[in-house]
Each structure stands twice: as C-alpha cells, then as structure tokens.
Amino acid sequence: MKQRQLALKILGEVEEGSFLNLALKKQLKGLSEQDRRFVAALLYTTLENKGRIDYVIDSFTSGKRIHKLVRNVLRLGVCQLMFFETVPESAAVNESVKLVEKSPKRQLKGFVNAVLRNIAQNLGKIEYPSQEAEPAKYLSIMYSYPLWLAERYLGAYGFDFAEAMLSYHKKAADTCVRVNRLKTTRQELLAKLEGRGYQFHEGEYIPDCFYIRNIVGVDELDLFQKGLLAVQGEASMIVAEAAQVRPGQAVLDACAAPGGKSAYLAQFAPGRLVCMELHEHRALLMQENLSRLGVEAECRVWDASKILEEQIEAFDRVLIDAPCSALGLLYRKPDIKYTKHPEEIQMLAETQRAILSACAQYVKPGGRLIYSTCTISQEENDQNIDWFLEHNRQFFQVNLAAVLPERLMSRAREGRLQLFPHLDGIDGFFLAVLEREKR
C-alpha cells in the first residue's frame, strides 16, 4: 500500500475514534523508515492543522457537505499544499486525485482535482477571521483548536499568552524516553543509542531523560523490549522526582496505569510499592510494563475514589496522577483536540475530589500526598487543591523549591507548579505536594 493511501486509511480510522499513535503502531509495521516518517508526518500535520485545513476547504467549496472519504482526501492534499515544501504542487494534487480514483467515490475525482488546483492557485488570497474583531475565532481557526477552548484561554490568559500556547507544537518524531536504572546506567544506554546510530538530545530538566529523533515504533527497539529504557514524558518524570521517595518507604500510586511513574518510583528502592488501577485491562498492561522494566510491585484493580479500610495510614507517599481532561497534551496529540468538551471538566473535577478525599486517608502522619494532572484547567488543579486544604486541615503545602529541578524553582508558588508546553518545552502538567501533620 502506497504512502498516501495508507495515510488516508489511518486518517479514516482516527476520524472513527481510533487513537493516532495506536493506529500508526498497527499500520506502519513492515514499512521502510522513510515511508514511516512520511506517513506519520503527513498524519500529524493534517490533524494538527485540521481546523484551518477544513476552513480552507469550506472556503473553496461554499461550505457544501462533502463525503467523509473525499474530505479526508482533500485534507491530505491541502496539508501538502500548505505545509510540505518538499512536495511539489503537482504531486499534492495528482496523488490526491489518484486516491479518489481508487475509492468508491471515483466519480468525484474531477471535483477533487478542481478544488485542489483552485486552492493551490489562491492560497495567498484566503481571508481568515479578523484577529481584532474576532480574536477567539481567529485563534480557533489559525491554530486548529475548538472555539470553546480558544475562548477559555483567551479569557484566562489574554491574547498573547493564548496565541503562544495554541501555536506551540513539538515535532511528532521526537520520542521522550528515560534510562531504567534498575537494568542499566545512563552511560551504558547512551553508548547503545549512539552505537545503533540513533539521533537524540538530552532532556530539559531530568538527567536520565532523552528525546530520540525521527523514530516511529519505539516499542520495536530491542532496548525497549529488554527494559533498558522506558517511554515517559519529562513532566511525568518531574512529578515522580517531586515525590522524594526514600529507601524502605511504603508508596502507593493510586491511578497507576500504564505504570510510568510507578516504574520511576521503583528506582528509589521503596520497601513496598502498590499500584492501583480502575480498569482490569489497563492493570494487565501495567503489569506487563512493570515486568519488562524489572519492577516488583503489588498491582490491584481498585477504584481510587473508594476507601480501602485496611490501607488507612499505611503509606509514606501517596501519588495521585488523576484522570483529567489532558489539555496539557493537546500540543502533541492532535487527534484528541476535537474530542474534548467543556462539560467534562467539571465532571472530572468532582471525580478528582473524590479520589483526593479517599487517598488522603492512606497517608501516614508525616507522610506526603502528591497530586498531579496533565491539564491546564483551573477547576482540576488549583481549585481542587484549595478545596482539599479547606476540608483537610491536617495537610499543608510543601515548599517545592527543594523537590524541583533548579530551572523550575522560580515557577513554583505556594507548594504548586503549573507547567505550560510553550513556556517549558514539555507537557502541560500541574503538581502539588501536600504533607500530613505529625501527631
């Protein structure tokens, strides 16, 4: 199957609800590295700019309804015209027409040809919403985010900050990994990566963090399969570091799957590591990941919002990486941008409060509760911590300066840290560390 035909197939799957990373993993097996990179780049770029691309298509088709397969062909074609300088205009148009010719909608090849040629000739004449008159609509179209999210950020942070945040994106080809010190050392892993010819650069904040360039299917690497490295975002590593786990301590990871933070915490030699997960299939995946990485842990299927009586005051550290709206990941997960809805934020905040209330009871006097999310929503972050402290006077906020990488110390405030992708170059995470008073 040719590159663009495969891209069209995967785009259709994503539009039907599949996750892009999983679809790529499944469909790219057996392809050359060059083909993998092109297909992945075409799909990431198309989805990253889907709102703007659709605006362009609608501008040249008078907003008429277009069959979803034909629209996807047009999306891929317009993406190449707008963002792929190495693809000739003629190739972007002609290859798109060929895709329609091979489809059940082959009778529309003339329509696709005419639309793409018209767009190619008039790209510089497209009128976008006015930044001054319609700032939220401008941000939504130009950076391909839902209008409600553009309005939300505009109201919370102002235009310049909102634009910087929405316009930021990271190369899809950079895969963030960390050294698994349970099986190797930093020096040994570096030597193996260099020996295999991989290009990589060091992380921004964590010494054991690396970004491998231009790789699709990292789980196919022998270094991954042997458990020498783990795929994990750098912001997630910062959260695990902030837990300040000491040898021999009892540690609970309350919302643990797929196990990235649990595996990181295991490197600090806790006396007991318990990993809880709500869904059995995710718990099984977590067990597989932990086993591959050489981690010994108790894995339990349990709803973290419900209290386990036998675990009350049993842990020195309790980590809650709460289920959240994941708004801090949208810059690198373009396929989920348009699956988000404002109503879910308040629902998630209520779930998070239930988890906080239950898990706080597992913390020993003098122990710590670490709360994190991968979102930028006030309701799920600061407002939750304010609520929790008001209802749990036995907890107080810890000064994060002692637990953060030096470059982030100035960003912490009152025991909390909010990371932004465009400011910090990593996922948008929230972190709060709370300590329970000693008796």
Residues covered by each model-derived region:
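S-adenosylmethionine
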Residues: 1-439
